[in-house]
């Protein structure tokens, strides 16, 4: 081979290597590879995710590069990748607020999301889930699963005291007052100023009372009667029926697992812990020593609640989504379709207690995925199928929870505002000030209103 021929061949090889080492693939790139980011960065879940996408590669010969990124790092990583032109093709386990924020910045591909949803069949998804991911009439991402905020209560204590299930503000207040005392808190709920868990807990009660962040025109409405009443209810409830201090996710869960609280507001991620399947958060109530699953057997679960200013029950929850980015390879839609179909039960199996299906089944088998979900193994060091831990009625309520899910801002097209206010958490700060007596509940609502108006002006 001549020197000139050798150099030409070498140059060709180097060019191929350079293309292969590039960032996110463009729309017209026919290379059979995808970059897949996921916010599920727990090592066990990363391993399980790799197994799922390996199945996709075997079926399609499309290679996937899996990158796990902590949820708290997603915003900065996406911003850097967007600036560098190296966006992933697909982003998994992205929250509702985050995908709406990405869409507002032009990072997601609504047409690609619509293609996936239509191919799978819109009728196979929760209608509410589809409506929550829409902006300007188009889906900004494909909803994959949900977790829901729950009010969990001790059925045995309620029965003994003759109390009604805590499905209304009135019933919650009555139970908290009646059961509080002798080392028992009537209820434990988040109260920490700089904690998103406080935001989620308040929003749960707010939407249940008909309180919305904004009206349809986008004006902040935290001083409306339903919102002012929710501030008052939250403060009164924790002052008279709970323990004092800045409660958070860890302390509230610990109190209920120790048998020191009759009610707790927590997410569905606590369900395996109630059954004693996690060594990091085990039930230690007096009865739990003989039966680690005592709390799972003796806890009632409420999803939707009704406040006095509301006309129907409602609840807070979170949707997680698959977002296809604007520069994605054409094969990205195929991957998401696989994850929402053949790979869907395994995806839900990463953490079934916190991954409730929002696609119930297929056109031919309408309940295929909800049925499969009830038999998925949950737990950490120990595992059991959900169906062995909770009765069918509880699982049915959880499986349909997305249908009564209500979220601030998204129905009003204010997804960007929702994301922006989570950066400074003005509502938890106002609540904490009311709980420690610095502000009255009414003044707390006014402070939160003013802070939200400032945030809204800054992003417009």
Which functions belong to the PLM regions below?
Residues 1-35, 443-446, 450-460:
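Short, low-complexity disordered leader/linker segments with a strong preference
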Residues 30-41, 62-67, 89-90, 140, ...:
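Short, well-ordered beta-strand elements
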Residues 31-51, 413-419:
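Extracytoplasmic "Venus flytrap"
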Residues 55-125, 156, 160-167, 262-263, ...:
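Extracytoplasmic "Venus flytrap"/periplasmic binding protein-like
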Residues 136-144, 173-220, 226, 254, ...:
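Extracytoplasmic/periplasmic solute-binding protein
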Residues 274-275, 289-293, 308-425:
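C-terminal lobe and pocket-closing loops
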